[in-house]
Amino acid sequence: CFSEAEITEKWMYVWKFAILRSVVSNILTNSEWNQDVTESDKNKLLEYANDIFPKYKVPMTIYSEVRNILSHYSTRNSFNEYAEKKEWDEIEIIVGDILKNLSPIYFFIDSVDEEYGHAPMYWLRCQKGLFYRVMRLLRKDTYGNKLHVIICIRDNVMASICESEHHTRYINEEHVKLLNWDYMTIQYFFESKIANLKDCYFINED
């Protein structure tokens, strides 16, 4: 296990690796998006298969990759060894070069807190790690504005971030949007959802 001070940092690594692995799986198997990926580029990534990531048959979600990483590297030593592999830097460069020739890809992470109530402090660290990782991706132009990760975190997680020593970085950050769910906003949300439902979901009053 990791010390309290290390947990958020380790979660940052988990999210980084999960995001990269998910992108790699899409580059290799997403035929609707990867049409401009050359066989040469695919082969560059396949050199790392079964070491850094498995052989993919289908595109994998970031959630799936988080789960797979945690199940395969469940001890302190095994995770640290995985995180310290020099191949990660190589993969990051290769992925960045490939993405430059592709359409932008978007990932949406909005249900990290489904288990929050069962272990709030554990999931607090998880979500903080996600937030810090995404903000670091935003500031690090490795992927040429082609990789976009949109996340949703709980209000108390954001409050904890704003109480940290680095809080000034995120005050008035243009990429952070606070959702204020007043009555009008909730009404608009539900009416928009209802408007998109098919007729078969409505009761015929006749």
Where does each model-flagged region fall?
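P-loop NTPase nucleotide-binding core
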Residues: 1-106, 115
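The catalytic "switch" region of P-loop NTPases
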Residues: 90-108, 112-206
